[in-house]
């Protein structure tokens, strides 16, 4: 018997949330299909990095407030079911709504009447109402709410408590139940209609994606004229409050930003030109760097190294990292391509020291802090992030 079941509960979104509710005194069961993650988490070992989570996992396992399972029958035992199933994109950049098919099927669903179903991950606008209608049509009297997460990977556990929680629902009862639940974690609750809440999450991520695209476009313009973008960036932002939030250049990737910008474009009947332009700029940066390097170096006869492969600094998640696009482009152009990353366990990963020793040219794929003390031995380093001493920001 559980107070809360989290579907997808051993991932980057579900697990920190489950730990937070367990810390608040609720009995939480994390349901997942990944047997390795379930076993690791039940053994008290986090399957990924998140600040403060290692200690909290041990604490809530000891208090028996938290456990993980592969058994989907646990869904029917809970008062609250939270799903962190999002709507991914297909190969044509359309949202895939069929991911909810099993949850909504009258024959396969483990839901029961009287439960509160909270959708937590990013979904295509209108999905919450669609889910509520499908459940009602299947004979389930379930309260349906959409309460999006907006946390950053690596600090999710901290931000669950520090960020306001957006709450929406398909009925007044759903809104009241969801509000009461999330007040266990934060006093700051913002109420919205369901489509407004769904758009808020898409707007948040798309706004960041566009900001990164502006920085990357500015970087490429400056670079094409032989200018250091970071000299200009400093001039723009130093003691100038209206440019305080202007980001630096770098790969804008990961499992959320690109996907959410394209979902918003789809929702806007593919008339969201800012989103499409941002996608072209951000996705094009790796190839731009390779093309510029090819104008300066004989790549065909060079061994080239990439420092960092995960999607952002000091993170162990490689999903949708543009460092992999960089690697693919370099493998087409270069004699040999090496890669190093302290957070990635792959047979082709080498140590950063070996990479520096063997490479004639080095790219920064992810600016992990561990590389700041790395002896680069005078090797040329292409560093669009300006993360390493001696790295080239002008290619």
What name fits each language-model region?
Residues 1-395:
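Structural/interface elements that position substrates and couple domains in central-metabolism enzymes
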């Amino acid at each position: 018997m559980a107070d809360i079941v989290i579907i997808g509960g051993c991932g980057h979104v579900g697990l920190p949330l489950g730990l937070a509710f367990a810390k608040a005194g609720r009995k939480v069961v994390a349901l997942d299909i990944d047997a390795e993650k379930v076993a690791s988490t039940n053994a008290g070992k986090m399957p990924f990095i998140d600040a403060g989570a290692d200690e909290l996992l041990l604490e809530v396992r000891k208090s028996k407030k938290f456990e993980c399972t592969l058994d989907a029958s646990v869904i029917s035992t809970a008062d609250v079911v939270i799903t962190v199933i999002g709507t991914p994109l297909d190969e044509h950049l359309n949202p895939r709504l069929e991911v909810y098919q099993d949850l909504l099927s009258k024959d396969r669903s483990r839901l029961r009447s009287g439960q509160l179903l909270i959708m937590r991950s990013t979904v295509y606008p209108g999905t919450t109402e669609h889910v509520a209608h499908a459940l009602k049509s299947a004979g389930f009297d379930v309260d349906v709410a959409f309460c999006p997460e907006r946390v950053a990977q690596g600090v999710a556990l901290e931000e669950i408590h520090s960020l306001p929680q957006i709450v929406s629902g398909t009925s007044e009862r759903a809104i009241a139940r969801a509000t009461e639940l999330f007040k266990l974690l934060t006093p700051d609750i913002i109420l919205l209609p369901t489509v407004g809440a769904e758009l808020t999450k898409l707007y948040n991520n798309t706004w960041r994606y566009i900001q990164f695209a502006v920085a990357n476009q500015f970087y490429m313009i400056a670079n094409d004229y032989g200018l250091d973008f970071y000299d200009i960036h400093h001039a723009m932002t130093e003691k100038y409050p209206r440019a305080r939030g202007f980001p630096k250049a770098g790969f804008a990737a990961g499992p959320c930003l690109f996907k959410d910008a394209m979902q918003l474009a789809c929702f806007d009947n593919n008339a969201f030109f800012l989103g499409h332009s941002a996608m072209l700029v951000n996705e094009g940066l790796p190839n731009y760097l390779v093309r510029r390097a090819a104008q300066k170096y004989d790549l065909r006869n060079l061994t080239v190294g990439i420092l960092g492969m995960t999607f952002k600094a000091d993170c162990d998640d490689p999903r949708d990292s543009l460092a992999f696009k960089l690697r693919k482009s370099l493998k087409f152009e270069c004699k040999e391509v090496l890669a190093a990353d302290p957070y990635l366990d792959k047979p082709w990963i080498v140590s950063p020291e070996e990479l520096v020793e063997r490479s004639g040219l080095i790219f920064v794929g992810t600016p992990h802090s561990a590389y700041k003390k790395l002896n680069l031995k005078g090797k040329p380093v292409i560093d669009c992030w300006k993360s390493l001493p001696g790295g080239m920001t002008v290619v």
